[in-house]
Amino acid sequence: AFIEAHRPELARVVLELHLEHAAAEHVARDGAVVPTGQPEARWWFTSRLPRLEAAVRGAVEAEKLERSFVVPPTIFGPQPTTDGGFFHLEGVPLVNFLTAPFYLFDAMDTLDKIHRASLVPVTRAAVRIVESTAGVSAAAMRGEADGQTSVRGAGPLGLRPRKRGGS
C-alpha cells in the first residue's frame, strides 16, 4: 500500500534501511532449547551498489559484528524475502538486516531470544551506513549499479545490465 501511494517519490529515496531481528542463537540440547551465547548469523541484504556494499562491510567490521554476511537481496530468488523486498523491486537501494533463527514466528519467539549484546553495535552500524550516504543523491547512488540494477520486470535474478555508452 505504501509503495503504491508513494511510487513517484521513490526515485528520490537514497537508501531504504530495515532492521528486522537481532536474535540470540539457540540449539536443541537434551530435549530443551538453550542459548549458545552467540548471535544468530547476521544477514545484511544489500543492493549491488559498490558504494553501499563498501559502507556495509566497513560498518560491520568497525562494529565487530562477527557472524555477518553481506549478500545481494536476490540471493534466494527474484523476490527478496525481507521486509525491504518490495522497495528493492522498485529499484530503491536497500540494506536489510536480519537474523533468521529457527524459532522465528513461533510461540517460543519471545523477548528473551534477543541477543542484547548486538543491539548497540547493530545500531551503530546502521548509523554508519546512513552517514555514508551524506551528500549522495538518489540518482548518484543508483548510478553506481556495478553494471546491474534491480527493477520490476527485470531478468531471472531481478537484475539487468546497465546501459553503457550511447547504445
Question: Language-model segments: which ranges?
Answer:
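Metal-dependent peptidase/peptidase-like ectodomains
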Residues: A1-L94
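His/Asp/Glu-rich mid-to-C-terminal helical/loop segments that flank catalytic regions of hydrolases
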Residues: T99-S167
